């Protein structure tokens, strides 16, 4: 009997694995790994792929030499190396430095005009963020109160919003936070 135990201890090939143990990772782990690979691969989109192909072409000698590539890039952007504006068809500079006439206010106006959101969309976004913050253990409530101030609409909408957040906080066992929310709700009414 001791011979068998010694043989098992010395020869691992005779040891049988349990049915639950296998060499490949579990299904969930494989799914997580695949998701990570997709996320990491998302950064390597067409831009990175085209850069890789250009580098490979330059290494193999089938593409444009680097000196000609610089001039073609300059033609494409319309700027020479000395930051002078150029005509698209030629390498002759037009003259003068290029400056931007846009201010930060113009940019903010364009962003709001290009993507107008309704009150419902904004409030739904705030509610999603609030619920996420509520579920985090040990959070400070100042951030949540700041988000609650961003709720848009009449007082009836704000009141419903506060009531739904109070219910969510009670569900998450945040009694002290519920007290603070009820005080704010009374002040609002």
Swiss-Prot record:
Its main location: nucleus. One of its GO terms (cellular component) is nucleus. It comes from the Eukaryota. Signal peptide: none annotated. Residues 81-119 are annotated as: Disordered. Transmembrane segments: none annotated. It holds the Pfam family INT_SG_DDX_CT_C. InterPro entries: INT_SG_DDX_CT_C, Integrator_subunit6. Keywords: Nucleus. It is found in: Nucleus. Testis specific. Expressed in cancer cell lines. Belongs to the CT45 family. This is Cancer/testis antigen family 45 member A3.
